[in-house]
Amino acid sequence: MKTKTLRTEKVNVITLGCSKNKVDSENLITQLKGNDFDVSHETKQKSDIIIINTCGFIDLAKEESIQTILDYAERKKEGEIKKLFVTGCLSQRYKDDLEVEIPEVDAFFGTLEMPALLSRLNADFKHELVGERWISTPSHFAYLKIAEGCNRTCSFCAIPLMRGAHVSRNIEEILVEAKSLARRGVKELMLISQELTYYGLDTYKKRMLPDLLSQLAKIEGIEWIRLHYAYPSKFPLEIFDVMAAEPKICNYLDMPLQHAQNEVLTRMRRQITVEETKELLQTARQIVPNITLRSTFLVGFPGETENEFQELCDFIEEASLDRVGVFTYSHEESTRAHDMEDDIPNELKMERANRIMEIQSAISFEKNKSKIGKTLKVLFDKIENGHYVGRTEGDSPEVDNEVLVPLKGNYARIGDFADVFITDASEYDLIGVINKIN
């Protein structure tokens, strides 16, 4: 048997930003490995070539991306690395400016320019590797991107400027990738795109997410399928029917609502009212009684009055969502909202974000306390600080609650499902003991 000879230059890929960027980096690494590169992901070891996959979503993300580029540009000047390439959303949006400001970078590439990046490295884009993605997550779960881009025109959002229009992947291609992941031990798939519920409208002329879910649920080895980034306007209610009928589809929905005051929603161009939102949440809970609802909200949008913000607070208390995240408004150039005055001081934006999280913390604590004395199915992700750390069906990695099980007196392996008896709870964690490994 022949031994593969790797290229002598070592490549390190750095990923910043969201799970969609993570998938892009994983696909890039797959192509580099297929071209015989010795490639690592975010290694501390010495590397010859650095590729930074950037985020340009909001100011904080842009600052992190720029600082990371500058750090590696300095290391290149000092001779620690030979080549520095930048790709991703920041590069897509500000390529011309970045080329002038950071000349140490050998080349900048946009979000859809992987073939050009590979060509710069004297490598080929290998179509046969599509669907055979290397994953950077623990081996038992993976993100599965079903579409790219977004057709929405939310006034605050720059994503369409960086990711382009919505393009759905072919169902057969998605299934091939999902089956490949399952063969390699993946048990949980997290479906992602900029707008999950739009899937299929461009290529199949109808919303195809329910059909895709039904087919993914047939794949042997996959036990959990989780839905991220659904858009509330014109939500296809058939998704709830599939969720209720198919045990593999997690009773979990991540649906960013952004706000809950009608005038603000209009200024945001969200194409939905508070009344319609409440009706959608009620329908979800009627069809899937034990559904976990996650959402994110945006505070400090231009013109947001104290009364408008209070209506948002009242909604969050009334809706009693299971998981909530908050962003403060970032005044993004070239968006429709950029023409409005960014009139909310940063201190007030942060104060409002903190007030939302105080409300949600109390809601989360009450919901978690109600789980004490119950036995829940848990998937273990890691060992940390003397505990197995896992998640329930109602929790996604990194952003949601965790279940902590002491190492002493319990035994499990990473990637195991187990029945865990809950003995205690805090605002964002559950504590328990293992009853049975599944």
Roles of regions detected by a PLM:
Residues M1-Y199, E238, I249, L253, ...:
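Proteins enriched for Cys/Gly/acidic motifs involved in redox and nucleic-acid/cofactor modification
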Residues C18, G200-G221, M268, H331-A362:
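Radical SAM enzyme [4Fe-4S]-AdoMet core and its adjacent flexible, acidic
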Residues K82-G88, R93, L98, R183-N307, ...:
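Conserved SAM/AdoMet-binding glycine-rich loop
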Residues I102-P103, D124-K126, R207-L209, M243-A245, ...:
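Short, hinge-like loop/turn segments at secondary-structure boundaries
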Residues P115, R152, T197, N262-E263, ...:
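Glycine-centered loop/turn positions within well-structured domains
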Residues C154, I174, L191, L227, ...:
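Conserved, mostly hydrophobic/aromatic
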Residues S193, Y229, L257-H259, S295-V299, ...:
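Active-site proximal loops enriched in glycine and acidic residues that flank catalytic Cys/His/Asp
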